Amino acid sequence: WKSEFQSIANKRIQRLESEKALSANPMMPQQVYPELAKALPKGAMVTIDAGVAPGLAYDRVFFEEPRTMFNYAGQGALGMGFSVGLGTKLGRPDRTAVSLHGDGGFLYTCGELNTAVRHNIPSVSIVLNNSCMGAEKSQQKALHNEKYVGVDLENPRFDKLAEVFGAKGYYAEHPSEIADTVAEAVKSNAPAVIEIPVQEYFPPSAPTPR
């Protein structure tokens, strides 16, 4: 079983390496994570919101310490990422706190920017904006012959929205901008939102409705 496990692990590493060759404009969400890894300090706490684009982090962000990955425990709690990200920073103010969101999930709880600013909680929220509800659109593509209902979004610029609340706002349009932008947001020691425009991504196996 050890050799089988090692074979699976090696295939994963090969797949992740192959993703570094992706080139798209707007970028694919897979292109975000190698660049994010360059900016995350050791021991950074990462909260992963529900959704397709942020969910890619499970396979692409390497967590080497306990209590550094936080998620919704499979309960489909869309939008929990922002509030939980703030909580991780309050619990461990000495650690970097980053939360990963799709645009749909972030819209659920972005009003908590008011909380972050009032209490000066320096958590960094990264919004992968593909202008849709990714999981639901994947289901409709797979199960309803691409008949889409209620899944496409018209969003604000989330970096500008953050600035309206008094937080820091950043925009990273190209993969080469991500690492420096994340590092700058962390260094600001202030509540911050980074918008990254990405393409829609439909997983090979669409999420199944329950």
Question: Which residues are covered by each model-predicted region?
Answer:
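Hydrophobic, well-ordered secondary-structure elements that form the walls
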Residues: 36, 48, 87, 103, ...
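Generic beta-sheet signal
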Residues: 44-46, 95-97, 123, 190-196
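Glycine-rich beta-alpha junction loops
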Residues: 50-54, 130-132, 198-202
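Short beta-alpha connecting loops at secondary-structure transitions
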Residues: 67-71, 108, 137-150, 167-168
